């Protein structure tokens, strides 16, 4: 049994294109407890799974996701695959794994769109929203009540108390923060999730033996990894 839950960061993104149905299915097959997908709105108000605000990194096209129609986004191809809409990812994971939705936008529109989407799916168990401010957490808690869980993707450790007071169920820290006294103290306040990588020249979600040792010593509730097979069951 693993010492913590594995969250497949952007799906099984170490081996498959990020934020795709292919990557989500592969993550579940590899034993991930949750699949993470990013959430942005198209010009038509549909929730699509893109990490970046533009298509530039994936396709070379500088167009903003928010300016692209559903038709345009569904026609996008990269690394031999295509981006998923969030309802596609949810249909893949529901009943098989949990889902962490990394909400990339502030404001009420994205939360309202997510509420409609998750309600249409029947409010499946195991859905988490990743939110970055106490204000957005409070808004989401009012809108969703307890029908979803919330992890605070807080930019700084000193925002923990505000995020918990607003209704967060868990706190996310970075691998490089895990050994800090402030991060150690947070374990007494809430379940802590750790995003691997973004240190020692590693990409977000990537790690190595030293990183896994640091993370393991922290004893988190969950870890976000690009490769869900790095930690044996």
Question: Whereabouts are the PLM-identified features?
Answer:
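Phosphate-group recognition and catalysis centered on beta-loop-alpha active-site segments
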Residues: 1-233
């Amino acid at each position: 049994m693993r010492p913590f839950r594995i969250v497949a960061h952007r799906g099984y993104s170490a081996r498959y294109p990020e934020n795709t149905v292919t990557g989500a299915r592969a993550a579940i097959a590899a034993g991930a407890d949750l699949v993470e997908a990013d959430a942005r709105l198209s010009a038509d108000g549909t929730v699509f799974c893109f990490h970046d605000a533009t298509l530039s990194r994936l396709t070379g096209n500088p167009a903003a996701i928010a300016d692209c129609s559903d038709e345009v986004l569904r026609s996008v191809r990269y690394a031999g695959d295509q981006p998923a809409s969030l309802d596609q990812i949810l249909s893949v994971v529901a009943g098989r794994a949990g889902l962490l939705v990394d909400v990339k936008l502030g404001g009420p529109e994205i939360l309202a769109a997510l509420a409609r989407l998750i309600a249409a799916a029947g409010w499946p168990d195991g859905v988490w929203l990743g939110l970055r401010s106490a204000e957005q957490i409070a808004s989401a808690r009012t809108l969703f009540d307890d029908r979803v869980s919330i992890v605070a993707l807080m930019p700084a450790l000193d925002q923990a108390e505000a995020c918990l007071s607003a209704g967060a169920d868990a706190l996310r820290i970075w691998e490089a923060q895990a050994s800090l006294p402030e991060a150690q103290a947070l374990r007494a306040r809430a379940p802590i999730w750790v995003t691997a990588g973004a240190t020692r020249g590693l990409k977000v979600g990537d790690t190595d033996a030293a990183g896994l040792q640091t993370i393991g010593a922290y004893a988190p509730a969950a870890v976000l990894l690009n490769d869900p097979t790095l930690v044996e069951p």
